[in-house]
Every structure is written in structure tokens, then in C-alpha cells.
A protein has these predicted regions:
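Small-residue-rich segments of transmembrane alpha-helices in multi-pass membrane proteins
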Residues: 108-121, 168, 233-247
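Central hydrophobic cores of alpha-helical transmembrane segments in multi-pass inner-membrane proteins
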Residues: 18-27, 88
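Alpha-helical transmembrane segments
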Residues: 11-18, 130-141, 202-205
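Multi-pass membrane catalytic core of lipid/isoprenoid biosynthesis enzymes
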Residues: 12-19, 34-84, 159-200, 239
Length: 254
């Protein structure tokens, strides 16, 4: 919303940064985890284990997108350029964290939390409290749902020496940790709305976001891990899209 005064080329560079960063992160995850994915029945059909893409081609894709991301960041402003290697370190580093820490979910949350901060830097050339609060919400929301998603791989992770919250703790305790993180996410979203007086439409989005998180924890209880699948992504997509849409409406009508 703050970018309404920017030129089309400038907006295009911000969009390209998002695409290149996501391509690099997803590609590196598939490349780094190719041997692990081949052992897991849930992921054995992914492109590299299935032989659809060679590891060398995947790595070339990652490198190309990393270079393109830095170049696009340089076009935006100096602060974006200087921070682009930090962003890439977090985005790519996440894929290695399951090898040594159960809290890889938090690193994934941090990787996604970079997005609102990066977008704010791209538009304003500075860092402020507003995007930081939004980043906290994204981090805790993402870490919370990733813990739930990882419940289905808990046994595999334990048997293969991989680390995750579900692999370390019981399903019940993992779910409680997820709930706590989602409470923090809801709190961050509420503080953001109250602090900046974002209006009624924002609070509609807040209500929808909170409701979807509650429904998620009702649907995916420890006793119903089998429900986690394609619908899991849809549920979390509804949470983010509804909150984002209502927030944009609130800012446009303020």
C-alpha cells in the first residue's frame, strides 16, 4: 500500500526479489535434502529423488536465482543490497538446521518473517517498528504450523537422526508448543492493530486470522495426524490471505 507512489519498474524489482528469493530457498531445500527425501515415502516423489531433475541442474538453478536476487536488490536501494546476503543466508541456511537443532521451525519462521521487513526496506529505505511487529507475527505463525506439519514425519526424523520439535517431544507437547506460538502470533497482530489504529477492516482480518488458527488446532489434533495433507496448506493459506486482504482494505480506507 505504501508503494502506490513508486514507479512500475521499481515495483517490478520488488516482485522479482520475492520470486528469486523463494526460488533460491525452495531449490536449495530440495537439493540439500535430496538424499533424505529419497528415504521418506512422503517425499520420495519429489523431482530430484524421482530423477526428474539432476542435482547439478538444481544447484545451478539455486545459484542463478541467488545472483538474480542480489542484482534485483541492488537496483532497489543500498540498504536492500547490503542486507541481501543476510537474507540469503537465512533462506538457504534453514534447510540445514534439521541436522542439528529441533528448533528448525523457528528458523523457517525467521526466513518468512524477512519478507515484510524486506518489503518495508524496499519501499522506504529504512527499518521501523511496524514491519518488525508483523515479522514477529509471521515468525510465530509459521513456526507454529510447521510444528504441526512435522508431526507426520516424527518417526522418520527420529530413525534418521533428524531434529524437530515432534521428534524430540510427544505429539501432545508439540501441539502445545504450536498453540503457544500461535497465541504469540495473534498477540503480535493485535498489538500491531492497536498501536497503529488500523481501523475496523483490520480487526475483521484479525478475527478471520484468529478463527482459522483455532480451526486448525481443532482439525489437526494429536489424535488426527492423518488429516494433515493438502488441506493443511489451504487452511494456512486462508489465514494469511484473509488477514492480508483485510489489512490492505484497512490501509486503503484509512
Amino acid at each position: 500500500v505504501r508503494s502506490r507512489g513508486l514507479g512500475d519498474v521499481y515495483k517490478r524489482q520488488i516482485l522479482l526479489c520475492m520470486v528469486f528469493a523463494r526460488n533460491a530457498a525452495m531449490g536449495f531445500n530440495r537439493w540439500a535434502d535430496r538424499d533424505i527425501d529419497a528415504k521418506n515415502p512422503r517425499t520420495a516423489g519429489r523431482e530430484i529423488p524421482a530423477g526428474k531433475i539432476t542435482p547439478r541442474a538444481a544447484l545451478a538453478f539455486v545459484i542463478g536465482n541467488c545472483v538474480a536476487f542480489v542484482a534485483a536488490a541492488a537496483w532497489i536501494n543500498c540498504l536492500a543490497l547490503w542486507l541481501s546476503p543476510v537474507a540469503l543466508a537465512v533462506l538457504l541456511g534453514y534447510s540445514l538446521t534439521k541436522r542439528f537443532t529441533a528448533w528448525s521451525h523457528v528458523v523457517l519462521g525467521l526466513a518468512l518473517a524477512i519478507a515484510p521487513v524486506g518489503a518495508y526496506i524496499a519501499v522506504t529505505g529504512s527499518i521501523a517498528l511496524f514491519p518488525m511487529l508483523l515479522a514477529v507475527a509471521v515468525l510465530t505463525w509459521t513456526a507454529g504450523f510447521d510444528i504441526l506439519y512435522s508431526l507426520q514425519d516424527a518417526s522418520f526424523d527420529r530413525s534418521n537422526g533428524l531434529h524437530s520439535v515432534p521428534a524430540r517431544f510427544s505429539a501432545v507437547h508439540s501441539t502445545l508448543i504450536s498453540i503457544l506460538l500461535h497465541v504469540l502470533a495473534v498477540a503480535a497482530v493485535a498489538v500491531l492493530g492497536a498501536l497503529y489504529r488500523l481501523g475496523v477492516w483490520y480487526w475483521v482480518g484479525f478475527g478471520l486470522f484468529t478463527a482459522v488458527l483455532v480451526v486448525q488446532h481443532v482439525l489437526y489434533r494429536p489424535s488426527r495426524i492423518d488429516r494433515i495433507g493438502a488441506s493443511f496448506g489451504l487452511v494456512n493459506g486462508l489465514a494469511s490471505v484473509s488477514y492480508a486482504a483485510m489489512s490492505i482494505v484497512a490501509l486503503l480506507t484509512a
